[in-house]
Amino acid sequence: MTMPGARGWPKWFALAALVIVLDQISKLYFNSRFQYGEIRPVVEGFFNFTLVYNPGAAFSFLHDAGGWQKYLFTILAFAVSGWLGWNIVKRRFSGLMNLAAAFIMGGALGNVIDRLAYGHVIDFIMVHYYNEWYYPAFNLADSFICVGAALMVADSMKKPSR
């Protein structure tokens, strides 16, 4: 089914490219200005910048698997991005779903660049509650993937038009 409000697929690909550029610039910045493991508080007790490398996936899943996971996550990112891109081009998504897809594609491909270039993903954002609770470090690509996923959920909860 073709969605009437989903025209202009190049803008969604441009948005995905912008996400990749922002992600890569931020990673280059932190990788060049921080020592590995260095922590700089931004909001004391809640938010830090740091520099860590993640050879696995979210929450360091499979970080110690021996290297094959890099290829698995790369193939998965290309497959998902290809499927999302195809659906954007074929106008099968609503406008909100296109936005979500662009965010997910940009984030996934931003992390693929890291995996292929460095063998790991560069993370630098650390959210925590003093010394009691720490969320795993993440990056802009991860943030865009999460926002995209939330937008997909929101889009799926909309009532269908008659």
From Swiss-Prot:
How the protein sits in the membrane?
Answer: Multi-pass membrane protein
The coiled-coil regions, if any, are none
Please give the start and end residues of each transmembrane region. 12-32, 42-62, 66-86, 93-113, 133-153
Pfam family of the protein (one): Peptidase_A8
Give yes or no: UniProt keyword Cytoplasm: no
Keywords (A to Z) from UniProt: Aspartyl protease, Cell inner membrane, Cell membrane, Hydrolase, Membrane, Protease, Transmembrane, Transmembrane helix
Subcellular localization(s) per the UniProt record:
Cell inner membrane
- Which BP terms from GO are recorded? proteolysis
Pathway(s) per entry: Protein modification; lipoprotein biosynthesis (signal peptide cleavage)
Q: Which domain of life is it from?
A: Bacteria
EC id: 3.4.23.36
GO cellular component: a single term? plasma membrane
Quote the catalytic activity from the record.
Release of signal peptides from bacterial membrane prolipoproteins. Hydrolyzes -Xaa-Yaa-Zaa-|-(S,diacylglyceryl)Cys-, in which Xaa is hydrophobic (preferably Leu), and Yaa (Ala or Ser) and Zaa (Gly or Ala) have small, neutral side chains
Active site feature: 123, 142
Q: Which family does it belong to?
A: Belongs to the peptidase A8 family.
Q: Which NCBIfam families match?
A: lspA
Which PANTHER family does the entry link to? Answer: LIPOPROTEIN SIGNAL PEPTIDASE
What this protein is reported to do is described as:
This protein specifically catalyzes the removal of signal peptides from prolipoproteins.
Name used for this protein in its record: Lipoprotein signal peptidase
Write down the species. Chromobacterium violaceum (strain ATCC 12472 / DSM 30191 / JCM 1249 / CCUG 213 / NBRC 12614 / NCIMB 9131 / NCTC 9757 / MK)
Name of the encoding gene: lspA
